[in-house]
């Protein structure tokens, strides 16, 4: 009788783990600053994985650090896509609609 319960727990753990790692999206940005037609993302802007918590050093948009690919989100994820034409310190600028890695 223990075996089915253990199997169920294993399946549930794998399902939760897979769901936590689903890619996400940046859902907000600076309404007045567009990058390739999309609002520029900044620290504090929201994603489906929580807020962006890490941005470019020394580059601010409306008083907030600009978000770039590789920046962290609240749940341990990262921004993983961005502009193909705008770079900050060699990293693509992140924008509303760009992808995140999902939570860790």
Model-based region annotation:
Residues 2-104:
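Intrinsically disordered, low-complexity proline/glycine-rich segments
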């Amino acid at each position: 009788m223990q075996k089915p319960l253990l199997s169920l727990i294993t399946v549930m753990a794998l399902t939760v783990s897979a769901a936590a790692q689903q890619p996400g999206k940046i859902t907000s940005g600076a309404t007045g600053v567009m990058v390739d037609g999309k609002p520029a993302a900044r620290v504090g802007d929201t994603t489906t994985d929580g807020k962006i918590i890490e941005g470019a050093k020394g580059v601010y948009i409306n008083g907030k650090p600009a978000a770039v690919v590789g920046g962290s989100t609240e749940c341990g994820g990262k921004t993983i896509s961005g502009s193909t034409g705008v770079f900050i310190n060699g990293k693509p600028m992140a924008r509303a609609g760009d992808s995140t890695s999902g939570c860790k």
